[in-house]
Amino acid sequence: MKQPFLLLVAVAGALAGCGPVRTTANILDAEVQIQAARTAGAEEKATYEWTAANLYIEKAREEVGYSDYQAGVSFAEKASQCANAARLKATNKDPEAAEKARRECHPETAEQKSGSPNP
C-alpha cells in the first residue's frame, strides 16, 4: 500500500521541478531570437514587432518571478514569435515568411487587417 503512494509522491515531485527548467529554456530561446532581431536591425526596421518581443520577454520574467511558470512559458514563446517576425521583417528577404511570422506574433491585428469583425 505504501509503495504506490511513494511512487505517486516521487512522480509529483519530479514533475514539479520541470516548470522552472522549461521556462528558463524558453526565456533563453526568446533572448537569442531577440538578439538576432537586433543584429538584423529590427529596432529601426520592425519597431512594432521588436517592441512586442521585448515587452513579452519582460512579462515572461515577471511571471516566473511570481512562480507562474506556465504563463512564463507562454509569454516567452510569444516573445520568440515576435522577435522572429521582427528579424524577418528587418531583413526583408522573404516577405511571405515575414507576414506569416507577423500574424503569429499578433493574430488579432491580422484579423482586423483582413476585415474580420473584432469579437
What are these regions (language model features)?
Residues M1-C18:
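Sec-dependent bacterial lipoprotein signal peptides
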Residues C18-P119:
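Long, charged/polar, soluble alpha-helical segments
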